[in-house]
Amino acid sequence: MYIIIMGLGRVGLSLANLLIDDGYDLTLIDDNESLCNEAAAELDALVICGNGTNSKLLEETNIEDADFFIATTGNDEANLLSCILVRKYDVPNIIARVSNPDHEEAFKAVGIDNVISPEITAAGFLEKLVTRPNVADLISLGEGDAEIFDMTITNDKVVGKRIKDISPTKDYIIIATYQNGKLVIPQ
């Protein structure tokens, strides 16, 4: 899978490191020469120093072969413009970082549906840590209509009981348990 990331700040570099560790083929774009030099020296990826809102530069990355284009700069306008340009190359997956949540509607108005705000995401995660301190991991589904979470149950009312005796209820369904360190999906 071929992924192009525009922006080599904290978000872009962190994402690049994770994707490289997972074995993905990356091209990284930034207009800051020192960030480009640092990334080129440290990462197993093609690094192009230039403006990601330039069509000719995007063509140099073989944008038409990309499976993903991810705009991670802290500049919403640059992210928006690059995503608009990338759409003409039929990249199947376009993701944009938005710094100002008020700008999210502008991205959606031009068909960029995958818009992420690291600040809002972090705030939501922190809120979950406060409101659900026993939850080890949490996945929200859809628009937050449902959630899957991993938690340790210490309530004497349910510990040691059969799953069919306590689930489903109107509030939850148990979909798996750990027994002796192994994941067990009930029948």
Model feature map: region roles:
Residues 1-187:
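Cytosolic regulatory regions of ion transport systems
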